[in-house]
Amino acid sequence: MSWDSYIDNLVAQTKDASGTAHSDRACIIGLDGGAPWTTAGHANALKLQGTEGANIAKCFKSKDFSAFMAGGVHAEGLKYQFLREEDAKLVLAKKKGEGAITLQASKTAIVIAHCPEGGQQGNTNKGVSVIAEYLESLGM
């Protein structure tokens, strides 16, 4: 099964009334180990590097976000400043000049999306939430 269509759906969910998407890249990784579910070949793929996926998954699996608080959230070789977590399922982070990332866990996956600098992270949060909650409704 290809998960890449979920990236398209997520980006579409972030559009505002004028049709502007507020997420330019996204991916889905497994909660158990951080292996990618979406492919890096997708035009809007958020490409985690090295151990980034495993480190993100470790924090969500353990529900211990102290590593994010102390060292930031690493994605695509960049360090984003941890802003907050909610309900041990949602993490928000930002990097000046780069934008922000939203991460939300379902039962078996973590949905991650990037909001470009100047975009509305709230719209990105909505897109991530729609996909994560859909996966959750499927028992995933």
Swiss-Prot record:
Modified residues (N-acetylserine): S2
Keyword Transferase: no
Keywords, ordered alphabetically: Acetylation, Actin-binding, Cytoplasm, Cytoskeleton
InterPro entries noted in UniProt: PFN, PFN_euk, PFN_sf, Profilin_CS
Function noted in UniProt: Binds to actin and affects the structure of the cytoskeleton. At high concentrations, profilin prevents the polymerization of actin, whereas it enhances it at low concentrations. By binding to PIP2, it inhibits the formation of IP3 and DG.
GO molecular function, one term: actin monomer binding
Subunit structure: Occurs in many kinds of cells as a complex with monomeric actin in a 1:1 ratio.
PANTHER family, alphabetized: PROFILIN (PTHR11604:SF10)
Identification of the protein by name: Profilin
Major localization class: cytoplasm
UniProt keyword Cytoplasm, yes or no: yes
GO CC terms in record: cell cortex; cytoskeleton
Compartment list: Cytoplasm, Cytoskeleton
Signal peptide (from-to): none
